[in-house]
Amino acid sequence: MDQYSALPSLLGRILLAAIFLLSGYHKLMDPQGTQEFMISMGMTTVTTLFYWGAVAIEIGGGLSLLFGFMTRTGALVLALFMIPTTLIFHSNFSDPNQMVHFLKNLAMIGGLMYVMTYGPGRLSVDGRSRRALLNESLMVAQEHRRRYGETGT
């Protein structure tokens, strides 16, 4: 990534994270209402397990995106979570509102795929870790050259 991509990458991660963090927070604040809605959409078995799984994935994945920590993994988990979620909750295409939500979710999955492919950018925990590892590797290589010369013997 070039020098101009750090800030847009950070802002993109924040915007993607926001919807997951807010959705997870709202689920956490209204467990009964959320589970009743899940049941009304046909999720009648192990609803509590699915509820807590959704809360964990949305908040955990949202934090992963926000801080850029284990970002590719967080984006992958969120994208995989969104596939069945989108098909279960937004597949009534005769309702224009549901079609909009379906397409919005597809766009979010696309954004998550972009994060999986190109990573979190420099302004992230992962980016700092990668730079620290690279700097350490460069210092080791420079010390090796200083001691042993270019031939390495």
Which ranges hold each PLM region?
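Membrane-interface interhelical connector segments
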Residues: L28-T45
